[in-house]
């Protein structure tokens, strides 16, 4: 199991146009097999919507939609971490 990211690092990932398998492994703090299954699940949903997918990646916008992520929430958490020196 890999170490999970700080909110500051999560914000940096969410500002990228695409997330790779390695990015998702860091995000979830899980291994390649688990992340691969999660990515296949998201790809299947995207294909059903008529979208094209690229193996081993997902657009950050699609990832945020699937996970219900609000970028502003992570930015606020990152600011708090910075103030607390975490």
Feature roles, as predicted:
Residues 11-34:
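Polyanion-binding surface elements
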Residues 1-2, 21, 39-40:
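A short alpha-helix capping/helix-coil boundary motif
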Residues 28-85:
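Major-groove DNA-recognition helix of helix-turn-helix-type DNA-binding domains
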Residues 1-16, 47-50:
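Short helix->loop/beta-hairpin flanking segments within DNA-binding domains
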Residues 3-7, 77, 86:
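Short recognition helix of helix-turn-helix/winged-helix DNA-binding domains
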């Amino acid at each position: 199991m890999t170490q999970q990211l700080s909110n500051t690092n999560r914000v940096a990932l969410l500002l990228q146009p695409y997330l790779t398998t390695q990015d998702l492994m860091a995000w979830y703090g899980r291994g390649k097999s688990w992340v691969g299954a999660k990515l296949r699940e998201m790809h299947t949903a995207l294909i059903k919507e008529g979208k094209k997918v690229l193996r081993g990646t997902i657009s950050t916008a699609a990832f945020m939609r699937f996970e219900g992520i609000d970028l502003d929430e992570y930015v606020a958490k990152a600011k708090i971490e910075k103030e607390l020196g975490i």
